[in-house]
């Protein structure tokens, strides 16, 4: 079991999974964006710069000690990316956690907010 993390020192990454292009955003607990709506290809070649974008934010912002990545579980489109990021040597020092979420639950959660 993993230890609890301090959310104030966590970079939160969201990835919208699609068949050809994924879209990534990253923000902190106070909702300050560090990556906003950046498209990346759904290929091995696209996963490398995506990993690099996250690693660059972590390098440039020493307040981050952890990274939490959330992505939609859309069949096989995101499986390889989830495995790649969870095994990343660049992200490993930040206790990376990758979660695949049910898209219906994400949609219903989003409906509970007026300003999203």
Give residue ranges: language-model regions.
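Phosphate- and other anionic-substrate recognition elements at nucleic-acid/protein interfaces
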Residues: 1-116
């Amino acid at each position: 079991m993993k230890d609890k993390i301090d959310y104030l020192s966590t970079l939160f990454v969201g990835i919208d999974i699609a068949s050809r292009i994924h879209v990534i955003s990253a923000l902190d607990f106070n909702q300050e964006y560090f990556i906003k709506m950046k498209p990346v290809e759904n290929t091995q070649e696209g996963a490398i710069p995506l990993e690099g974008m996250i690693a660059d934010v972590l390098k440039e912002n020493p307040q981050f000690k952890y990274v939490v990545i959330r992505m939609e579980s859309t069949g096989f489109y995101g499986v390889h990316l989830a495995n790649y990021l969870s095994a990343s040597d660049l992200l490993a020092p930040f206790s990376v956690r990758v979660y695949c979420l049910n898209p219906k639950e994400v949609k219903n959660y989003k409906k509970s907010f007026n300003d999203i």
